[in-house]
C-alpha cells in the first residue's frame, strides 16, 4: 500500500465534497473543481475526511492509490487557498503587461507574444518583470506557468530569459580566450 495513500484527506468546514462513482466534485469558497479519477481505487467519505483505498491488490490499483489521494488533497487545497506560480523576466528590454485578460510578453522577438488564459486562471504583473499565474487547479496553473517560461527559457551564460522565481540557473563559463 502507498504511504501517501494511507493517510486520509481532511476536509475543512467550508468545503463540500461529492463522490459520484469515479467522479469527485469539490466545492469551496474559491470555486468548484470536478475530476474523473482512474479505476482501481475506492473512495469513502467519513465525517470531515475522505479515505482512499485500492479496490484490488493488483499492481495498477496500488499505483493509483497515492495518486488519487494526492489529487483529492490538491483539489481541496485549491478551492480553499488556491495556487500561484511566480515568474521573473530577466534581460534588457524584456517585459510583460496585462491587456484585459491577455498577457503580452516582449521577450526579444520581433513581435510581442500574447497568451490568453484558460477559464479559472488569472495573470498579474508587478513592475513589468514579475508575472504571477494564479488559479484553483494546480495542474493548469503549473502548465500555464510552463508555457510562459517556454517563450524564452533562461540561457546558461548570462541568465537572460523567463524563469520561475525560486529557480536557480546553472551558469556556464564563456569561451576562454586564445593564449
Swiss-Prot record:
Task of the protein: This protein binds to the 23S rRNA, and is important in its secondary structure. It is located near the subunit interface in the base of the L7/L12 stalk, and near the tRNA binding site of the peptidyltransferase center.
A cellular-component GO term for this protein: cytosolic large ribosomal subunit
Pfam families: Ribosomal_L6 (PF00347)
Stated name of the protein: Large ribosomal subunit protein uL6
InterPro entries in the record: Ribosomal_uL6-like, Ribosomal_uL6-like_a/b-dom_sf, Ribosomal_uL6_a/b-dom, Ribosomal_uL6_bac-type, Ribosomal_uL6_CS
Domain of life: Bacteria
Keywords noted in UniProt: Ribonucleoprotein, Ribosomal protein, RNA-binding, rRNA-binding
PROSITE patterns: RIBOSOMAL_L6_1 (PS00525)
Family: Belongs to the universal ribosomal protein uL6 family.
GO MF, one example: rRNA binding
Assembly mode: Part of the 50S ribosomal subunit.
Amino acid at each position: 500500500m502507498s504511504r501517501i495513500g494511507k493517510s486520509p484527506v481532511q476536509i475543512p468546514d467550508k468545503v463540500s465534497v461529492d463522490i459520484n462513482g469515479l467522479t469527485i466534485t469539490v466545492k469551496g469558497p474559491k470555486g468548484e473543481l470536478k475530476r474523473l479519477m482512474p479505476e482501481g481505487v475506492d473512495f469513502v467519505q467519513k465525517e470531515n475526511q475522505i479515505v482512499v483505498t485500492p479496490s484490488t491488490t493488483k499492481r495498477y490499483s496500488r499505483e493509483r492509490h497515492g495518486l488519487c489521494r494526492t489529487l483529492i488533497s490538491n483539489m481541496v487545497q485549491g478551492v480553499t487557498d488556491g495556487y500561484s506560480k511566480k515568474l521573473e523576466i530577466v534581460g534588457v528590454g524584456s517585459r510583460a503587461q496585462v491587456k484585459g485578460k491577455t498577457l503580452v510578453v516582449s521577450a526579444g522577438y520581433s513581435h510581442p507574444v500574447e497568451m490568453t488564459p484558460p477559464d479559472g486562471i488569472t495573470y498579474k504583473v508587478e513592475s513589468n518583470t514579475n508575472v504571477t499565474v494564479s488559479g484553483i487547479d494546480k495542474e493548469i496553473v503549473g502548465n500555464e506557468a510552463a508555457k510562459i517560461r517556454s517563450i524564452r527559457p533562461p540561457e546558461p551564460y548570462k541568465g537572460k530569459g523567463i524563469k520561475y522565481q525560486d529557480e536557480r540557473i546553472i551558469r556556464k563559463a564563456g569561451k576562454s580566450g586564445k593564449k
